[in-house]
């Protein structure tokens, strides 16, 4: 099982070891679902965690709220991506939608050059895409080179156990072309069971250890 620990800045990072987690998603402001951490935080986190053989996926999100970004915000995201790459990030986590809750392909294409080939993860903005469009969205993300999607299986704050069928559907459709990582209510106590129920061995959360 691959466990990704969702961390707010540096506070808990010294307590982690590679026996507990494979990867850290590094954020600021978890109270709003996570935003881009500072350059200094990213750099120090990467140095600390790389010594522990733990990889770092850095959140690129300029604010809380929706996932529809204007030109100014996209330029800020572009700069943040460049700095996150420079600071040593192993992957970048982002999510961009249109006002109709479809993938914002124009915005993705605008940001891609700045990522410099780093692995890309689409975060839980994915859950806001209508269910009947999610398979198409997976295909598009694969075409853009995304390696992983983080999903709760629903945009609602429902128990993740209520979303098992939708998560299974995504895992089956993805068929190992892109990783499906489950989150939002995954804990150290239930991760093994959820992995078996959904068919993915990749789990994410603040309480997975």
Curated annotation (Swiss-Prot):
Instruction: From the Swiss-Prot or TrEMBL record, state where the protein is found.
Output: Cytoplasm
- InterPro entries recorded: CutC-like, CutC-like_dom_sf
GO CC annotation: cytoplasm
- A UniProt-annotated Pfam family: CutC
Coiled-coil ranges (or none): none
Q: Which family does it belong to?
A: Belongs to the CutC family.
Q: Give the matching PANTHER family.
A: COPPER HOMEOSTASIS PROTEIN CUTC (PTHR12598), COPPER HOMEOSTASIS PROTEIN CUTC HOMOLOG (PTHR12598:SF0)
UniProt name for this protein = PF03932 family protein CutC
Question: Can you name the source organism?
Answer: Streptococcus pyogenes serotype M6 (strain ATCC BAA-946 / MGAS10394)
């Amino acid at each position: 099982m691959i466990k990704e620990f969702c961390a707010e800045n540096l506070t808990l990072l010294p307590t982690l070891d590679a026996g507990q987690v494979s990867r850290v998603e590094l954020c600021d402001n978890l109270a709003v679902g996570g935003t881009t951490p500072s350059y200094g935080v990213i750099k120090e986190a990467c140095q600390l965690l790389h010594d522990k053989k733990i990889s770092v996926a850095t959140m690129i999100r300029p604010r809380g709220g929706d996932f529809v970004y204007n030109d100014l915000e996209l330029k800020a995201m572009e700069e943040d991506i460049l700095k996150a790459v420079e600071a040593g990030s192993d992957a970048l986590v982002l999510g961009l939608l249109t006002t109709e809750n479809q993938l914002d392909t124009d915005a993705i294409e605008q940001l891609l050059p700045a990522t410099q080939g780093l692995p890309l993860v689409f975060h839980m903005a994915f859950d806001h895409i209508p269910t009947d469009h999610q398979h198409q969205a997976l295909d598009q993300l694969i075409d853009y080179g995304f390696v992983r999607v983080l999903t709760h299986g629903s945009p609602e704050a429902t128990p993740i156990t209520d979303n098992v069928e939708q998560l299974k559907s995504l895992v089956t459709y993805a068929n190992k072309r892109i990783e499906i990582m489950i989150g939002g209510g995954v804990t150290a106590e239930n991760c093994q069971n959820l992995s078996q129920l959904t068919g993915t061995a990749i789990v994410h959360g603040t309480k997975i250890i």
